[in-house]
């Protein structure tokens, strides 16, 4: 699924809590400098994937790392699937950074893991400025999902579909993929029906055009035949008239 939209902003309270935590934490030891470096690299990779500044990345976005990581497209898909623990089709910055660090074997200290866990909770609770932005983000995700399924023109304006999709995503995520598969099949069927309808209309138009052409040809042939017949009859009348005139002249001459 390709998700479009504006990047959600970090709330002022979140910035203050992060700055306070950084100011009071103990200096990192050489043992945990590598994880910090890894998290920074993960952030850079996330930015490379998130060219549109959506605030999250999809499986397609992750393919942009082919030039950065020695991984094939199939391996990148496998990486995405392993990081997408919630099976919602996208990764947040926290999910990507934490998951990538674990995937590459970076061992965090107990204190660092605890802090990252707190950071993750902070991100979850403070990333958005309010419910309106969350609704906008979900609406954009739904739109992107429908676009990916090829169903945007069919189901985009159906509020019932939108509400059911949102409810499954929040309450029954294990059923969401089945619902999206159903939408994909229905939209594919509707597109096929529309294609057949368009094909039939084009065939009828061609048939009408061919029929009109045949009618015009018949009309032209009929006009030509009428013209020939008219000329033949006129010629016949002229011949008869000329013959009658000659007979009449002979009759007059004989009487004289």
From Swiss-Prot:
InterPro entries, A to Z: Ca-binding_regulatory, EF-hand-dom_pair, EF_Hand_1_Ca_BS, EF_hand_dom
Domain EF-hand: 41-69, 71-106
Residues where Ca(2+) binds: 84, 86, 88, 90, 95
Source domain of life: Eukaryota
Species in which this protein is naturally found: Xenopus tropicalis (Western clawed frog)
Encoding gene (name): cracr2b
Keyword Metal-binding annotated: yes
Similarity comment: family membership: Belongs to the EFCAB4 family.
Keywords from the UniProt entry: Calcium, Coiled coil, Metal-binding, Repeat
This protein's name: EF-hand calcium-binding domain-containing protein 4A
Basic residues: bias regions: 1-10
Region of interest called Disordered, as start-end residue ranges on this chain: 1-32
Keyword Lipoprotein applies: no
Molecular-function annotations in GO: calcium ion binding
Coiled-coil regions listed in the entry: 190-235
């Amino acid at each position: 699924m390709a998700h479009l939209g504006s990047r959600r902003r970090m709330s002022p309270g979140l910035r203050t809590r992060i700055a306070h935590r950084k100011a009071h934490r103990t200096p990192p030891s050489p043992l945990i400098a590598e994880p910090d470096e890894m998290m920074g690299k993960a952030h850079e990779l996330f930015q490379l994937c998130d060219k549109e500044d959506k605030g999250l990345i999809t499986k397609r976005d992750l393919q942009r790392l082919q030039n950065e990581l020695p991984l094939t497209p199939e391996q990148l898909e496998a990486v995405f699937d392993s990081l997408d623990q919630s099976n919602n089709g996208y990764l947040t910055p926290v999910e990507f950074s934490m998951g990538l660090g674990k995937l590459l074997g970076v061992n965090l200290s107990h204190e660092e893991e605890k802090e990252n866990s707190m950071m993750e909770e902070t991100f979850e609770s403070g990333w958005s400025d309010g419910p309106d932005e969350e609704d906008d983000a979900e609406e954009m995700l739904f739109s992107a999902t429908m676009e990916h399924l090829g169903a945007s023109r069919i189901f985009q304006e159906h509020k019932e579909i939108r509400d059911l999709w949102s409810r499954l995503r929040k309450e029954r995520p294990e059923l969401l993929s089945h619902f999206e598969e159903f939408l994909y099949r229905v939209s594919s069927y509707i597109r096929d029906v529309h294609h057949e309808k368009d094909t039939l209309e084009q065939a009828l138009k061609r048939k009408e055009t061919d029929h009109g052409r045949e009618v015009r040809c018949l009309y032209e042939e009929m006009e030509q035949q009428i013209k020939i017949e008219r000329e033949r009859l006129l010629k016949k009348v002229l011949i008869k008239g000329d013959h009658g005139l000659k007979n009449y002249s002979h009759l007059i001459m004989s009487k004289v």
